[in-house]
């Protein structure tokens, strides 16, 4: 009986760890999919990393819902961007919710012919995300960009 109980406990722990690993992977993929979609001019992919009622907070601006988030990208057409994302840290809070912090360096230019000459990064900061499990899978429920360094002359 005791060995059965130990086996059940170990099985439960293993299942929980596997579930947590899947959540970490799904949330990390959202961080990367956001950057890739933005950098490759894919407004639908960009908006679809967010939940239907997702929120993006950026330098005092609030974009709520996929249509508003998609429009934000369309309004910046003609720009070439590159997001370098690192140090992705996922904290699983429940089987349906996780928090993510990632570092981001963004360069934006109006030129479209490669290679683009630039004077440096446009933004150096962090994304603070709340990810939620939805009927569509894991999505960003809320993303806030936090400036860490400002660039001067």
Model-derived features with residue positions:
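Sec-dependent N-terminal signal peptides
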Residues: 4-12
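Short, low-complexity N-terminal intrinsically disordered segments enriched in polar/charged residues
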Residues: 12-44, 48-52
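Transmembrane beta-barrel outer-membrane domains
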Residues: 25, 80-81, 120-122
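Short beta-strand segments enriched in hydrophobic/aromatic residues
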Residues: 38, 50, 104-106, 144-147
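A solvent-exposed, acidic/Ser-Thr-rich amphipathic alpha-helical stretch
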Residues: 43-107
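Short beta-strand edge/turn micro-motifs at domain boundaries
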Residues: 97-99, 122-153
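Extracellular loop and loop/strand-boundary signature of outer-membrane beta-barrel proteins
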Residues: 115-116
